[in-house]
């Protein structure tokens, strides 16, 4: 719950800032995520885990504003409620199915490929069809990540020192599901 409180603070801060801040904040967020997930042995990782929801909240404010302008308040709110329901359902699935830890590497490779293509497409114009496909792949990927992360918890693969990182994983699963469902619908 503390991540959501920090996200709320980030949303408030985002409402006070110019939308021009999104790109630098997004870059900082990506760098911090890379540090958290690939350099886990640093003493200050927990500090970064607390900073990330604030940064995500700032960018989420402007992302949500963009989709509210495109789709309207009611649809964005409906997608948010729908994302909550889907997330809970995926979590339940992850808790009841047998161990699926072997898919973790495939999910990571898919995520890295998706990130690379997303970065490339920032510099090269692409059509709505490609963006629709990318958003669809991202929705599927983060759905699978949600099932996978809950499954990791269920089968005892989360060590005590990694609890805050797993909380961050689940938080990011939800945020990415929400944003990518919005992106998919807007295409």
Feature-to-residue mapping (PLM):
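A hydrophobic alpha-helical transmembrane-helix feature that marks the membrane cores
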Residues: 1-187
């Amino acid at each position: 719950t503390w991540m959501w409180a920090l996200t709320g603070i980030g949303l408030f801060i985002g409402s006070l800032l110019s939308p021009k801040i999104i790109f630098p904040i997004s870059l900082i967020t990506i760098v911090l995520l890379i540090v958290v997930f690939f350099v886990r042995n640093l003493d200050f990782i927990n500090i970064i885990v607390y900073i990330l929801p604030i940064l995500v909240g700032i960018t989420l404010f402007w992302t949500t504003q963009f989709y509210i302008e495109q789709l309207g308040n009611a649809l964005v709110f409906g997608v948010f409620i729908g994302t909550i329901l889907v997330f809970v359902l995926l979590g339940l699935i992850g808790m009841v199915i047998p161990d699926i830890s072997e898919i973790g590497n495939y999910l990571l490779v898919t995520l890295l490929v998706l990130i690379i293509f997303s970065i490339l497409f920032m510099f090269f114009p692409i059509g709505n069809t490609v963006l629709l496909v990318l958003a669809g792949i991202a929705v599927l990927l983060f759905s699978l990540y949600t099932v996978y992360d809950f499954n990791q918890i269920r089968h005892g693969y989360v060590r005590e020192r990694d609890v805050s990182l797993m909380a961050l994983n689940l938080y990011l699963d939800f945020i990415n599901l929400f944003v990518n469902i919005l992106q998919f619908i807007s295409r």
